[in-house]
Amino acid sequence: MKEYQVYLERARSRQQDFLYPLIFREYIYGLAYSHNWNRSIFVENGGYDNKYSLLNVKRLITRMYQQNHLIISANDSNKNPFLGYNKNFYSKIISEGFAIVVEIPLFLQLSSSLEEAEIIKSYKNVRSIHSIFPFLEDKFTYLNYVSDIRIPYPIHLEILVQILRYWVKDAPFFHLLRLFLYHFCNWNRFITTKKSISTFSKSNPRLFLFLYNFYVCEYESIFLFLRNKSSHLRFKSFSVFLERIFFYAKREHLVEVFSKDFSYPLPFFKDPNIHYVRYQGKCILASKNVPFLMNKWKHYFIHLWQCFFDVWSQPRTININQLSEHSFQLLGYFSNVRLNRSVVRSQMLQNTFLIEIVSKKLDIIVPIIPLIRSLAKAKFCNVLGHPISKPVWADSSDFDIMERFLRICRNLSHYYNGSSKKKSLYRIKYILRLSCIKTLACKHKSTTRAFLKRSGSEELLEEFFTEEEEILSLIFPRDSFTLRRFYRNRIWYLDILFRNDLVNDE
């Protein structure tokens, strides 16, 4: 990020802190290219086309200003008749430029806030997305009720842009951003359908995620205020790093809205045991108290989205369940609280008592059905989980084919090693292992049985030991009790920064 600071200081000295001129800087697109090229992907490493011209980008922006009276809908051809260039390709280039430009000043504000709060070191320790599970194991065993909430999408992208305007004050920049969304994202509708937003998020992932994260950050800031008003306790693990422009005016308006809808003031409902966890567009709300207070929080969320962000949300989409009877899905895991009952005989003098002890344990397991569905979509097996060959990889060498399957198998094993039950993980390994053998047999135009007999199945299957198993097998014998016990225990890795591509929370 030192490159960001150098480029931003240079641009500030020349352009007096405006973001709009940065759109026409070539190093901005170089940073965007470097970000996409170096980002690690779990399943397959995809390239990024670097055959772009800054001159063509400038011409396209100029043409957008000159032809702003024309409506270029999503049904138009990929070739713009006025330019002769691929419209979809250059729209992605410009969206990358927008995303990288607005990220620069906000990242510097975030870094300075983190340094002032002196939490840089602790922040680096919890960068892994798996660091959330030790928190769940520590807190959720004492809770009784849970609500699985899907954060609704805005009905129009203009809502996301307006939220961004509270942070960045640059009228030309936002004029160009709106013009871009109008021309290339079919923004000439009063209501943007979910399909249109999904299409935009896939074609412009970085820009959409940036706008969406602003929307989530805004709603969570207000939620933090409500939570502090409803509890004597304060968040110690959460900080508002950036200044909230117009936040106090919004807060007063929000209190007025809630005071009209509820007959009791917010401080009346004290809930010190509320816990909130979110990843991307899904959040988990859990509490120890009665469902009445959880139901109040449910209505707070609905009124917040509908009255403050103009986002429609139905009350029936948010369910409140007992944690011991309901599993919630987060980051590709199914989690629930299991009750372990044990009977202890206690004797006092000549009287004997039987005492039933109930202990709670958080079970975190691999969702086998969604994972098999993802493997079937990637053509590793059918919908029933039966392994099949992958003919599209048959043109590669034997080493490359095995290396691809090994990479996927190791990444899945690395990601799901925190599971309480490893049986489902072993089944996934078996599917990938047999799919690899079938692919190699298909390449050599042989049956699976004949290929295994000719190549030696033991040596081939030995390659599918994960890196952790290989290291541990050098320390402990493969048939030792210590090694088998270590395999059964949960292991959380703090180096996982991205969710696996085969993981699906839907």
UniProtKB/Swiss-Prot annotation:
GO MF terms held by the record: RNA binding
GO cellular component: chloroplast
Taxonomic source organism: Trifolium subterraneum
Protein role: Usually encoded in the trnK tRNA gene intron. Probably assists in splicing its own and other chloroplast group II introns.
Coiled coil: none
Location in the cell: Plastid, Chloroplast
UniProt-recorded name of the protein: Maturase K
Keyword RNA-binding: yes
PANTHER family linked: MATURASE K
GO biological process, one term: tRNA processing
UniProt cross-references to InterPro entries, sorted A to Z: Domain_X (IPR024937), Maturase_MatK (IPR002866), Maturase_MatK_N (IPR024942)
Family designation: Belongs to the intron maturase 2 family. MatK subfamily.
Keywords linked to the UniProt accession: Chloroplast, mRNA processing, Plastid, RNA-binding, tRNA processing
HAMAP family from the UniProt entry: MatK (MF_01390)
